[in-house]
């Protein structure tokens, strides 16, 4: 699970 400060990322 990876999310960045701008809220765009990947959820696994």
From Swiss-Prot:
Q: List the disulfide bonds.
A: none
Any Gene Ontology CC annotation: membrane
Q: Which GO terms describe its molecular function?
A: G protein-coupled receptor activity; photoreceptor activity
UniProt lists the family membership as follows: Belongs to the G-protein coupled receptor 1 family. Opsin subfamily.
Please indicate which superkingdom the organism of origin belongs to.
Eukaryota
Q: Which GO terms describe its biological process?
A: bioluminescence; phototransduction; visual perception
In its miscellaneous comment, the UniProt entry states: Each Drosophila eye is composed of 800 facets or ommatidia. Each ommatidium contains 8 photoreceptor cells (R1-R8), the R1 to R6 cells are outer cells, while R7 and R8 are inner cells. Opsin Rh3 is sensitive to UV light.
From the Swiss-Prot or TrEMBL record, give the protein name: Opsin Rh3
User: Where is this protein found?
Assistant: Membrane
Q: Which gene encodes it?
A: Rh3
- Stated role: Visual pigments are the light-absorbing molecules that mediate vision. They consist of an apoprotein, opsin, covalently linked to cis-retinal.
Q: How does it sit in the membrane?
A: Multi-pass membrane protein
Tell me the keywords, alphabetical order: Chromophore, G-protein coupled receptor, Luminescence, Membrane, Photoprotein, Photoreceptor protein, Receptor, Retinal protein, Sensory transduction, Transducer, Transmembrane, Vision
């Amino acid at each position: 699970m990876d999310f960045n400060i701008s809220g765009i990322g990947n959820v696994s």
